[in-house]
Amino acid sequence: MDYSKSKQAFKEAVNLMPGGVNSPVRAFKSVDMDPIFMERGKGSKIYDIDGNEYIDYVLSWGPLILGHANDTVTGALNKAVLNGTSFGAPTELENKMAELVIERVPSIEMVRMVSSGTEATLAALRLARGFTGKNKILKFIGCYHGHSDSLLIKAGSGVATLGLPDSPGVPKGTAENTITVHYNDLDAVKLAFEQFGDDIAGVIVEPVAGNMGVVPPVEGFLEGLREITTEHGALLIFDEVMTGFRVGYNCAQGYFGVIPDLTCLGKVIGGGLPVGAFGGRKDIMEHIAPSGPVYQAGTLSGNPLAMTGGYYTLSQLTPESYEYFNHLGDMLEAGLTDVFAKHNVPITINRAGSMIGFFLNEEKVTNFEIASKSDLKLFAAMYKEMANNGVFLPPSQFEGMFLSTEHTEEDIQKTINAFDNSLTVIL
């Protein structure tokens, strides 16, 4: 494919923005190529500025569950924007959106809208600390919860340790209040609570990890977290920014039948516009200002465009939508399994609803340590060929693929064929 216009655009961008992008993964560094600059999308397809067409499995990193430029969503947005983009005062649509979220998400009795997933997790941690009067948060290695200081933490040595900053600019004092253990390791969680339990305000977890690839919880893991946090008076916080309305009609918590105290949302609930939300038990949420003493505010929180995008996205999703995702996922998994076996390349495939992840290794992936063993050089080579074959994948081994209601069986078969062609070229 011809990428000449994208190459020129990136050459200009590196002098205008750090790394030439506004979010690091968009730089395509892990696949050793210049980023592809996109121009438009429709349905399951996305088109770059050179005119190349791709079947899109990035979907703006998850929000576009109805595909690109859904007619109902864009029609509602066109109407809404003519009424004004933001008012700094409540709107009736905020009520309708809140009612819809409360109806669909089992844990949420009250909800606060914000403007990003990072803002949602940041506020949820502040609320957990304010509600419990405790300081420490336990998170899992490889689970990404946005770029707030207390969550940009990785583990030191040992099973359960005080965290170390994962980015320059994160104070050590902040890191010391974050405990990190391996995802899916309930024994490590128990040990952490034995050591620090009197001061752990909450456990934050992606019910399906989505930023080390796609890594579902092992049997009993989420149930164990629910039991341990309840026993110690800590809050269980589900970060469903990615999994919310992607894993199931009632989010991951409905799918797995484990109800947290607080839930963070984003991505799908904005229909492609900037948005976030956090909610949970009424007695906890009433600690948020102006009802309570825990402060949180935002100029664009609940803005009418994001609420419009979210409301008209969620309104179109039905339980049957998720049956369709499962059908397409079954087809893709079977096809990839056959293709990689044909080429004698090891592959592990993980799925959760409309999220699919594959790893180029033989061992079943249950945490970041195992995910890191994937063949990154092979992934990078394959990525380039997949793009040349008209398939747009996330440009990182540690990001999952997303399906939309607009993907078709034909799209899936073309994708399977593209993997076959790509492996034929590079092996």
UniProtKB/Swiss-Prot annotation:
GO biological process, one term: protoporphyrinogen IX biosynthetic process
Organism per entry: Macrococcus caseolyticus (strain JCSC5402)
Xref: HAMAP family: HemL_aminotrans_3
Subunit structure and binding partners: Homodimer.
Catalytic activity, reaction form: (S)-4-amino-5-oxopentanoate = 5-aminolevulinate
SUPFAM superfamilies linked to this entry: PLP-dependent transferases
Protein name in UniProt: Glutamate-1-semialdehyde 2,1-aminomutase 1
Enzyme nomenclature, EC number: 5.4.3.8
Positions bearing N6-(pyridoxal phosphate)lysine: K267
Family indicated by similarity: Belongs to the class-III pyridoxal-phosphate-dependent aminotransferase family. HemL subfamily.
Molecular function via GO: glutamate-1-semialdehyde 2,1-aminomutase activity; pyridoxal phosphate binding; transaminase activity
Cellular component terms per the entry's GO annotation: cytoplasm
Keyword Isomerase: yes
Pathway noted in the entry: Porphyrin-containing compound metabolism; protoporphyrin-IX biosynthesis; 5-aminolevulinate from L-glutamyl-tRNA(Glu): step 2/2
Cofactor entry: pyridoxal 5'-phosphate
Signal sequence bounds: none
CDD domains: OAT_like (cd00610)
A Pfam family that the UniProt record links to this protein: Aminotran_3
Subcellular location: Cytoplasm
Transmembrane residue ranges: none
Keywords assigned: Cytoplasm, Isomerase, Porphyrin biosynthesis, Pyridoxal phosphate
